[in-house]
């Protein structure tokens, strides 16, 4: 009886030991699997954003103008452009071509700064911006040139045109010939020396790209132009007449408009052209030329120019 009891106990012990052995084998196998399995990293959710985020300084500003352009004055390369190939009226910005031909004539020795210019009836009667001079008055080329580029005097433009080419009509022919030589577009057509609308309704037309190219060549070929266009005021020898710049960006006290390095170049306005401005400024080794055409107010042409110049210098500097 005792042998039977001990036999049963022995069998029960063997069964328990077997169960324990299988249990520990399973645990060890499970631990081994955990240690050897590669780590699975969950993929991050997509954000929908581009991998490359454009820095704010590379985002061009919104410009409220019919047309606009920025070029690098060192090489003529375009930095920004909008509607730059539409031919529109440039108003007095066309006087940059008048100044170009005057400076060319001076460099060629055909005209001199102290040449006396007798004012014709046509010149004296020219409308719009003008200096106080009458028919038969005599002014020097230098005085007329300062009045042209600082105060945008239309009567000075006509007087200079007549002095260089005998008549304004002849001068306009020179303007259009020079436009071709400078490789301005076929859309560039000069109607007179001042930028005013003619009695028959015709007027000068240029694209913003044409205006920028003209300014580029004017500064490149005759950098002395900036010695005049950076002036806020100047006194003429003729009757001590004071001329005041139409470029309000030259005023350092006007924080909303002024930008460091501004030294030109030419404003423009007629009813058909709207308010226009070709500006240039230099910061460090970088000079830019900007053009805005067809803005809605006198101040707007300068605020939009400030935006363009700030953007350009952020890129270049």
Model-found features: residue ranges?
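N-terminal Sec-pathway targeting helices
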Residues: 1-13
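Active-site-adjacent loops and short helices of periplasmic peptidoglycan-processing enzymes
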Residues: 3, 30-209, 219
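Hydrophobic membrane-targeting alpha-helices
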Residues: 9, 18-26, 105
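Hydrophobic alpha-helical membrane-embedded or membrane-associated segments
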Residues: 12-16, 268
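Hydrophobic single-pass membrane-insertion segments
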Residues: 22-33, 313
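Penicillin-recognizing serine hydrolase domain
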Residues: 33-35, 53-56, 61-65, 167-317
